[in-house]
Every structure is written in C-alpha cells, then in structure tokens.
C-alpha cells in the first residue's frame, strides 16, 4: 500500500521497518526472557496486533465509535519468523515472491507468509525438538491475517480482487 501511494523507496522503507517491528519484539523477548518460549512466541503477535490496530491511525466512524486502523500484518508476521530463526525469513520471503508472481494475489501472498511459518516451525519442532510455541505463533499470525484480510478474501471469492504478477499478463 505504501509503495502504491508514495513510491518504491517509501514502500521499501515501510516494509523493512514493519519486518523489523516483528523481528525486534522477538529479539528483545529472547534477550530478556531466553527460556520463556511462550513469551517469545507471543511477542510478535503483539507487534502484529499493534500494526493492525494502531492507536496512531485511530478514527471515529459515523456513529462516533473509535476505530483503530492499520495494515494486515504480513510484514510484521514475516519479521516474527525472521526473529525466531533468520533462515525462515529468507525461505518465506522467496516463497512469498514466487506465490505473488505466479498466483498473482497480494492477499494470498500475505496469508501464505504466516502459514509458511507455521509449517516451518512445526517441522523444526518435530525434527529438531524446537518449542511448539513458535508453530503456535504461526497459527495465531495466520488467524490474525485472515481476520484482517476479510474484505480481500470476499473479493477473491467473488472474483473481484486485483491480479498482479505473471497471471496478470495472461
């Protein structure tokens, strides 16, 4: 959204800062509470919630109710995964670029970011004995992204969502 509204550099800067928002919470939690895997796993959940429901983007609706604005949390979700295990961030980023290019829907790409982290950390828990808390993070992040992207999902199901990437040229 930032890239569409203000150009490539603003969009890139915004994406980097949003990724660092998620990763930074994990790094801080790991530093201060290295043995509390559940607290570490929930740190980026709160970053996603703060991103999606920012007090800095608060508005009143027509009935006067306060509505907190924000994004979907995809970049913050990627950052959370990056904070747990940096190779996961690279794996997810590469797969997300491929999904975006070949599937062509930004919302599907955003949802896949958290879903991929669930699979990666479930695999690490099974194979390497990692804490299951990180896989649970992926499930919660996926749920938050699905909730935030409800309008996009409705457009997808109706066939009205914007197409990007390779499929747009077909």
Question: Which residues fall in each region the model found?
Answer:
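Alpha-helical transmembrane segments
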Residues: 23, 93, 143-147
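Nucleotide and nucleotide-moiety/phosphate-recognizing core
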Residues: 10-16, 21-65, 83-88, 96-97, ...
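Interhelical loop and helix-boundary elements at the membrane-water interface
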Residues: 1-23, 52-75, 102-112, 148-170
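Interfacial segments of multi-pass membrane proteins
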Residues: 3-6, 26-33, 71-103, 116-125
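Loop-to-transmembrane alpha-helix initiation sites
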Residues: 90-91, 106-114, 129-141
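Short alpha-helical transmembrane interface motifs in multi-pass membrane proteins
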Residues: 9-10, 79, 134-137
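Mobile late-domain/C-terminal helix-loop "cap" segments
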Residues: 120, 136, 140-150
